[in-house]
Swiss-Prot record:
Pfam families: AA_kinase
CDD domains: AAK_NAGK-C
Protein name as catalogued: Acetylglutamate kinase
GO molecular function, one term: ATP binding
Amino acid sequence: MQQQINPEIIQEISDDLRVQVLTEALPYIQKWRNEIMVIKYGGAVVKQDADIIKDILFLTCCGFQIVVVHGGGPLINEWLKQLNKSPQYWEGIRVTDKVTMEIVEMVLAGKVNKQLVGSINANGGKAIGLCGKDANLIVAKASSKKELGLVGEIEQIHPQVIDMLLEKHYIPVIASVAASHDGTTYNLNADVVAGELAIKLKAKKLIFLTDTKGILADINNENSVISTLNLKEAKNLANTISGGMIPKVNACICAVENGVEAAHIIGGKEKHQLLLELLTEKGRGSMIVV
């Protein structure tokens, strides 16, 4: 049984726009139908979830198999501050001590994960929330950078539970928390999780929804989005990107090098950017290909 979308979502679109969108989208729908796409839902855009959820459900109605990986950094910081604990970073990565790890797990695997699952289901979808611990989906190990504390790296991925859910037309929603073989809980970088899952699942596309419109040629001009890059061009960005864009671009490069057909970085704060990027010729964000 395919996902059933809330009819109100379609009614919001004018007749002329419906025809235009469907005509342009049809070749892309035919090409990607039944293919897996991994969408990384950045913590900075979680508050814009209503429109993004509609886009995700539209894609599932078209037959795309969607896997969602989410972050939640801003909300983690809010909870840390409520407990009078200041967020700590080392080389741009969150330092995760035992108390911080408990908050990270509570926020990501609890609040944010269930919020997204609830939103999808309320709009007629069928979502199930997971974290790396569930069915040993992701086995973690300690980072080689001891300064980071309980920040982990991916040791193994066992995707069978995702395969089972996709076969039954569910949308897996995954929080980036996992345990090691000895049961220690680790905080994983959600960008890395999304990229590695895309490779393991043999996804055709990896999509990052962020608070910027894409990869910018000029960091001071938000409209200077680079539409398409090959791997060589993406690797040459090392000196022009910074902060949270670095792990996203690196994950895109790794995914494309390992069989993912295309990786996208797009803005999540404006309506329907996901559909415009995937189902139109012009697109809206940045796409990295071989």
